[in-house]
């Protein structure tokens, strides 16, 4: 008798996606982050659902409802901190996942890559709106500063900002709609993830060598399910240590003060995972230019496949490109650091140099280095 997982209409889909899926035999731990992102999304949806049961999206009670969750709800504090720090783990895995894609040339799977970029934007939008919900000082001022950037759009800018705010400032209407969007977007993300996987399974996974895996495939289960479980254990261990020992390590102390429109915090800054983009935004004196640079800092990922000049898919055997890649990584760390610093000398100059280097590396230096490597390899 045929196994039910191979005949049942629904289980057949699951089987071909996660059990009998032919996978390259040589993919490394860098390929773990896809499943870890799925786990992060599940954690965020479950904890978020429980938080939504006790949260009130109203300017008068939002801050106290979060306090109520932490103090009065059974295990409320751990649900709240799992959700807050789960977002950090989510972005950590996202950045590593994208970095792996750039290093090993996974961007040549165009459809998967482009859906991935849409996913990145959607997750960033969700995280931004979620940060506004506790209605602390940094929530309020972060929302004010970032939404206000849209006023840089010529002609329709001011109207657009007031339309998003639902009034003439960030207020009750803004909080209510941000809560509604923050609730619905993770489900849209889940649907996009399925499309992402659909396109991935059309072509099959890339591998560290960048060569075709057609002649050497192994079943996903048990080989990669056990490998993914190990990665999941490390993820949960890190998240648990963070939540139980220093839950506020990655947060901002200003957010423990209720939102006050009459008092501006000394340094308005987003969560750590947006700091690199925030640094790029601040490094350009012109408002519209800054907004365009901010969008391009992520959207530049969509141009990477067009700029691919190398004859080899991965950077595994291209030492010069590897050096450029790690300089780019160091540059992103620098931008993240600068984004958290006040707007004063020498941080402004460092930020501007790092921003120019970021775009130069991706648009000019790395494609040129790839061409040089082609010449060296007589290709």
Swiss-Prot record:
Its cofactor is heme b. GO terms for biological process: mitochondrial electron transport, ubiquinol to cytochrome c. A ubiquinone binds at residue 201. The chain crosses the membrane at residues 33-53, 77-98, 113-133, 178-198, 226-246, 288-308, 320-340, 347-367. Heme b b566 binds at residues 97, 196. Binds 2 heme b groups non-covalently. It is found in: Mitochondrion inner membrane. InterPro entries: Cyt_b/b6_C, Cyt_b/b6_C_sf, Cyt_b/b6_N, Cytb/b6-like_sf, Cytochrome_b, Cytochrome_b_C_euk/bac, Cytochrome_b_N_euk/bac, Di-haem_cyt_TM. Keywords: Electron transport, Heme, Iron, Membrane, Metal-binding, Mitochondrion, Mitochondrion inner membrane, Respiratory chain, Transmembrane, Transmembrane helix, Transport, Ubiquinone. It holds the Pfam family Cytochrome_B. Heme b b562 binds at residues 83, 182. SUPFAM superfamilies: a domain/subunit of cytochrome bc1 complex (Ubiquinol-cytochrome c reductase), Transmembrane di-heme cytochromes. Disulfide bonds: none annotated. One of its GO terms (cellular component) is mitochondrial inner membrane. One of its GO terms (molecular function) is metal ion binding. It is a multi-pass membrane protein. PANTHER family: CYTOCHROME B. Component of the ubiquinol-cytochrome c reductase complex (complex III or cytochrome b-c1 complex) that is part of the mitochondrial respiratory chain. The b-c1 complex mediates electron transfer from ubiquinol to cytochrome c. Contributes to the generation of a proton gradient across the mitochondrial membrane that is then used for ATP synthesis. The cytochrome bc1 complex contains 11 subunits: 3 respiratory subunits (MT-CYB, CYC1 and UQCRFS1), 2 core proteins (UQCRC1 and UQCRC2) and 6 low-molecular weight proteins (UQCRH/QCR6, UQCRB/QCR7, UQCRQ/QCR8, UQCR10/QCR9, UQCR11/QCR10 and a cleavage product of UQCRFS1). This cytochrome bc1 complex then forms a dimer. Heme 1 (or BL or b562) is low-potential and absorbs at about 562 nm, and heme 2 (or BH or b566) is high-potential and absorbs at about 566 nm. Belongs to the cytochrome b family. This is Cytochrome b. It comes from Microcebus sambiranensis. The gene is MT-CYB.
């Amino acid at each position: 008798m045929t196994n039910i997982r191979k005949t049942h209409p629904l289980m057949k889909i699951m089987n071909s996606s996660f059990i009998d899926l032919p996978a390259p035999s040589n993919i490394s731990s860098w390929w773990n982050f896809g499943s870890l992102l799925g786990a992060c999304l599940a954690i965020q949806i479950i904890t978020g659902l429980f938080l939504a049961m006790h949260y009130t999206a109203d300017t008068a009670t939002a801050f106290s409802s979060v306090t109520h969750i932490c103090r009065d709800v059974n295990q409320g504090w751990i649900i709240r901190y799992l959700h807050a720090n789960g977002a950090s783990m989510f972005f950590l895995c996202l950045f590593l996942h994208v970095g792996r894609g750039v290093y090993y040339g996974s961007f040549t799977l165009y459809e998967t890559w482009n859906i991935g970029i849409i996913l990145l934007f959607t997750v960033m939008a969700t995280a931004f709106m979620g940060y506004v919900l506790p209605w602390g000082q940094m929530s309020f001022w972060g929302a004010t500063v970032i939404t206000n950037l849209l006023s840089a759009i010529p002609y329709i800018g001011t109207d657009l900002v007031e339309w998003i705010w639902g009034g003439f400032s960030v207020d009750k209407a803004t909080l209510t709609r941000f809560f509604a969007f923050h609730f619905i977007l993770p489900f849209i993300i889940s649907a996009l993830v399925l499309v992402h996987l659909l396109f991935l399974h059309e072509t099959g996974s890339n591998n560290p060598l960048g060569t075709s895996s057609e002649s050497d495939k192994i079943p996903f289960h048990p080989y990669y399910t056990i490998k993914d479980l190990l990665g999941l254990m490390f993820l949960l261990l890190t998240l648990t240590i963070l939540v139980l020992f220093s839950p506020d390590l990655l947060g901002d102390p200003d957010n423990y003060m209720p939102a006050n429109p009459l008092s501006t915090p000394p340094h308005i800054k987003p969560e750590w995972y947006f700091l690199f983009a925030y640094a790029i935004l601040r490094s350009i004196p012109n408002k519209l230019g800054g907004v365009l640079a901010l969008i391009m800092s992520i959207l530049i990922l969509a141009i990477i496949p067009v700029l691919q000049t190398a004859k080899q898919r991965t950077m595994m055997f291209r030492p010069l490109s590897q050096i450029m890649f790690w300089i780019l990584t160091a540059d992103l760390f620098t931008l993240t650091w600068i984004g958290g610093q006040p707007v004063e000398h020498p941080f402004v100059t460092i930020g501007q140099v790092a921003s120019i280097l970021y775009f130069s590396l991706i648009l000019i230096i790395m494609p040129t280095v790839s061409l040089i490597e082609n010449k060296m390899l007589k290709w």
